[in-house]
Amino acid sequence: MSSRGTRFRSESTLAVDGRTGATVRQVTAAPAIHHHPFFFVPAYDDAMRRLVFVSHRTGAPQLFAEERASGDLVQLTDQPGIAEWSVHPSHDGRFVYYTAGAEGWRVDCTTCEAEQVAVFGDVALREQGMVGAAMGTTALSRDDRWWAVKFNEGPVACLAVVDTRDRSWEVILRRDTIGHQQFCPDDDTLLFYAGPLTDRVWLVNRDGSGNRRLHERAPGQWVTHETWLPGRRELAFVDWPHGMRAIDVDSGAERQVTTVNAWHAASRRDGRRMVADTNFPDIGLQLFDPTDGVGAPTTLCHPAASSLGAHWAGPFPYADGPVAVHAPQHTHPHPSFAPDGSRVVFTSDRTGFAQVYEVTVGEEFA
């Protein structure tokens, strides 16, 4: 018997960050791994009716949502083989998109009925490993029509775009490696994708034309964790551990965003604030203005996550190609804003199990 639609009573508890005074709400509490979607993927629908997360409480990763109206936690899926970092809620709140096996799926958030959206054939939707392209993240355009999914045909990486209206799809790009694809929030005909670790920052048009490098890294530079800045047609990236930079995708102009050791940074919907976790050293979640060329940081709270990944403490490790690393993603905070900017969702394993949290953002950061 399927456990889809099972409701769990609210597990919410409130606490105050002892160093910043911020109000922190723990959303999940079961003794299992939980995490929200990756940092550049929204965890909420636009109306904030639900907070979507992944829970292992049933013994395998399944999609769940916290309902705002009731506080209940609702199990949305009961399906084997879900790629837990492929999760992408639709902006209109109707569906959550995800991959399982070699197929694309979506689940109706009201009925918990899952439907197949695409069958990609004899392919691998994830590469080996814990980071980058191995995570299997997907991207949904701002209007919820276009869904970008990466898979591998043998050694060849393929980027497919699915039309969610008629469920047709086509491969728009084939190359050596593709990961972390993201639609531009202001132009659903344009995508960023991460290429090789030594040459990461690329753009491609939704129809497959215009594949081009946006940034060429300097020797020894560690470029990672790219994300769009809404309203500006700029792509920001982490220049680890020296801060963040941004590039105008039309002019190619490059600028400094912040010098704080931002690790995973996400923009607020209006593009006027970013939030980032930090590591080596972990100085907590940092808020800053990404538009003023300074990005002076203010500490929001301290997730106290284990943030595993010892390779981040040293120089760029991928000069001679990929290397094996131990960096379980559920140990990383991956903060991101709610659509209205009133709170930030993050994950922390500080209790011994990875749980989902929200922290309130004060009015002084409006």
Predicted features along the sequence, with ranges:
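Solenoidal tandem-repeat scaffolds enriched in leucines and small polar residues
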Residues: 131-213
